[in-house]
């Protein structure tokens, strides 16, 4: 089907565009951008007056739990949640059951996503076999089967020597390494950020040094091997300082943060709220301010949700034993738009961090509205006001710390390959 998107504020940092334009889509690709374009016979029309039109948003860090953990989420429900949140593409982490450390699992994900998914799914393979940190996975096979990056996300690669070899091998393969930066010996039995709140609640803490030390190690290894490195879910002031300094030295390091790290602090854990339990943990107000500053100055390249669904039975337990992680696909856009309202980011800068930069980091042919590009488009209603309600969420799991929050901003239309896969009705 052909489509004309009329009269929206088109923001495409890849072309330096920020103006009211029409977009004509033909055969799943961008045919033309211009003013006063006419709809061809039989074309659908999207009235985007008063709305913002951007390259399709990309979440480069999600857990779809498929295969093996479909009671939490699966490719169908996960991509439905992505579409509802305005995402046209997601990159799914390998901590499935079995772990995505081989061609067969990757091929399953690619095939199921193509057959049943609403949005593009780009698999991330495991750095090590079984994500056990003992031996490297076959990165060449993973890339050939469709993986766009490798990560042991959920666990760090403990061995520095193995991480060095991973960076060297991945560089040769032309595939990005995504680091889960965490020193487990410093984490110990910690379950939340170490500080005043953990002491008050009587919970064992995770020091900021656990993230900072691991970030420093991986940055130095990237510098030593002259290899690209992406650091996931950055949450501390110290890690951001390390990354900022590394970038200034010319190290090929990029990083992401998640909306919860610029929207919540460890105060959210009060009341032993297991929906505020994730890894890395929510940090202090000083860390939150540092995350916003790093978004503003470009130290942080991308915003990614770390969407981590869990069954109610895995969260409705004592805080110490509750699993880490929260869902985020459907709340990311309004929480991120708040950064624009607060003056932390301009709208074009936000689009860069949610579309253009993730595409560039992962090396995927998305994140642009250039003529001839795949017509992955997000149409945003910045004025939409809505309340986060468990029953209205598309995700199979409901483990969100934002339940009951009033949000401003939503995806009016999510368009994948020229097809409207979500419209806000």
UniProtKB/Swiss-Prot annotation:
<feature type="binding site">
    <location>
        <position position="63"/>
    </location>
    <ligand>
        <name>Zn(2+) 1</name>
    </ligand>
</feature>
<dbReference type="InterPro" id="IPR050138">
    <property type="entry name" value="DHOase/Allantoinase_Hydrolase"/>
</dbReference>
<feature type="binding site">
    <location>
        <position position="153"/>
    </location>
    <ligand>
        <name>Zn(2+) 2</name>
    </ligand>
</feature>
<feature type="binding site">
    <location>
        <position position="95"/>
    </location>
    <ligand>
        <name>substrate</name>
    </ligand>
</feature>
<dbReference type="GO" id="GO:0008270">
    <property type="term" value="F:zinc ion binding"/>
</dbReference>
<dbReference type="InterPro" id="IPR006680">
    <property type="entry name" value="Amidohydro-rel"/>
</dbReference>
<keyword id="KW-0378">Hydrolase</keyword>
<dbReference type="GO" id="GO:0006145">
    <property type="term" value="P:purine nucleobase catabolic process"/>
</dbReference>
<dbReference type="InterPro" id="IPR011059">
    <property type="entry name" value="Metal-dep_hydrolase_composite"/>
</dbReference>
<keyword id="KW-0479">Metal-binding</keyword>
<dbReference type="InterPro" id="IPR004722">
    <property type="entry name" value="DHOase"/>
</dbReference>
<feature type="binding site">
    <location>
        <position position="279"/>
    </location>
    <ligand>
        <name>substrate</name>
    </ligand>
</feature>
<feature type="binding site">
    <location>
        <position position="306"/>
    </location>
    <ligand>
        <name>Zn(2+) 1</name>
    </ligand>
</feature>
<feature type="binding site">
    <location>
        <position position="153"/>
    </location>
    <ligand>
        <name>Zn(2+) 1</name>
    </ligand>
</feature>
<comment type="pathway">
    <text>Pyrimidine metabolism; UMP biosynthesis via de novo pathway; (S)-dihydroorotate from bicarbonate: step 3/3.</text>
</comment>
<feature type="active site">
    <location>
        <position position="306"/>
    </location>
</feature>
<dbReference type="GO" id="GO:0004151">
    <property type="term" value="F:dihydroorotase activity"/>
</dbReference>
<feature type="binding site">
    <location>
        <position position="233"/>
    </location>
    <ligand>
        <name>Zn(2+) 2</name>
    </ligand>
</feature>
<comment type="function">
    <text>Catalyzes the reversible cyclization of carbamoyl aspartate to dihydroorotate.</text>
</comment>
<dbReference type="InterPro" id="IPR002195">
    <property type="entry name" value="Dihydroorotase_CS"/>
</dbReference>
<dbReference type="Pfam" id="PF01979">
    <property type="entry name" value="Amidohydro_1"/>
</dbReference>
<protein>
    <recommendedName>
        <fullName>Dihydroorotase</fullName>
        <ecNumber>3.5.2.3</ecNumber>
    </recommendedName>
</protein>
<dbReference type="GO" id="GO:0005737">
    <property type="term" value="C:cytoplasm"/>
</dbReference>
<dbReference type="InterPro" id="IPR032466">
    <property type="entry name" value="Metal_Hydrolase"/>
</dbReference>
<feature type="binding site">
    <location>
        <position position="180"/>
    </location>
    <ligand>
        <name>Zn(2+) 2</name>
    </ligand>
</feature>
<feature type="binding site">
    <location>
        <position position="61"/>
    </location>
    <ligand>
        <name>Zn(2+) 1</name>
    </ligand>
</feature>
<dbReference type="GO" id="GO:0004038">
    <property type="term" value="F:allantoinase activity"/>
</dbReference>
<feature type="binding site">
    <location>
        <begin position="63"/>
        <end position="65"/>
    </location>
    <ligand>
        <name>substrate</name>
    </ligand>
</feature>
<keyword id="KW-0665">Pyrimidine biosynthesis</keyword>
<keyword id="KW-0862">Zinc</keyword>
<comment type="similarity">
    <text>Belongs to the metallo-dependent hydrolases superfamily. DHOase family. Class I DHOase subfamily.</text>
</comment>
<dbReference type="GO" id="GO:0044205">
    <property type="term" value="P:'de novo' UMP biosynthetic process"/>
</dbReference>
<feature type="binding site">
    <location>
        <position position="310"/>
    </location>
    <ligand>
        <name>substrate</name>
    </ligand>
</feature>
């Amino acid at each position: 089907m052909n489509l004309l998107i009329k009269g929206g504020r088109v923001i495409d940092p890849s072309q330096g565009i920020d103006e009211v334009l029409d977009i004509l889509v033909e055969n799943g690709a961008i045919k033309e951008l211009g003013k006063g374009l006419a709809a061809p016979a039989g074309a659908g029309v999207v009235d985007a007056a008063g709305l913002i039109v951007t390259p399709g948003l990309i979440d480069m860090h999600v857990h779809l739990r498929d295969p093996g953990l479909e009671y939490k989420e699966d490719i169908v429900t996960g991509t439905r949640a992505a579409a509802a949140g305005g995402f046209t593409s997601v990159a799914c982490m390998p901590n499935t059951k079995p772990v995505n450390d081989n061609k067969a699992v990757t091929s399953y994900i690619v095939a199921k996503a193509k057959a049943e998914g609403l949005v593009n799914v780009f698999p991330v393979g495991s750095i090590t076999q079984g994500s056990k940190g003992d031996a490297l996975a076959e990165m060449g096979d993973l890339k050939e089967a469709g993986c766009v990056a490798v990560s042991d996300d959920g666990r760090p690669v403990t061995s520095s020597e193995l991480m060095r070899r991973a960076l060297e091998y991945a560089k040769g393969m032309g595939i990005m390494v995504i680091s889960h930066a965490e020193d487990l010996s410093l984490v110990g039995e910690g379950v939340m950020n170490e500080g005043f709140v953990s002491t008050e609640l009587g919970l064992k803490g995770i020091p900021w040094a656990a993230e900072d030390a691991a970030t420093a190690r991986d940055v130095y290894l990237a510098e030593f091997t002259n290899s690209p490195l992406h650091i996931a879910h950055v949450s501390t002031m110290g890690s951001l300082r390390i990354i900022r300094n590394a970038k200034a030295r010319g190290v090929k390091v990029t990083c992401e943060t998640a909306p919860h790290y610029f929207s919540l602090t460890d105060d959210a854990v009060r009341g032993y709220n297991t929906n505020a339990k994730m890894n890395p943990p929510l940090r202090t107000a000083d860390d939150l301010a540092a995350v916003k500053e790093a978004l503003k100055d470009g130290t942080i390249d991308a915003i990614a949700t770390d969407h981590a669904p869990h069954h109610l039975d895995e969260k409705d337990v004592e805080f110490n034993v509750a699993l880490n992680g929260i869902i985020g696909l459907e709340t990311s856009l309004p929480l991120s738009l708040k950064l624009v309202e607060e003056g932390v980011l301009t709208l074009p800068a936000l689009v860069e961090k949610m579309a253009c930069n993730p595409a560039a980091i992962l090396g995927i042919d998305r994140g642009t509205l250039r003529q001839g590009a795949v017509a992955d488009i997000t149409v945003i209603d910045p004025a939409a006001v809505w309340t986060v309600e468990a029953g209205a969420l598309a995700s199979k799991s409901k483990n969100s710390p934002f339940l009951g929050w009033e949000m401003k901003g939503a995806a009016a239309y999510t368009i994948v390959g020229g097809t409207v896969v979500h419209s806000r009705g």
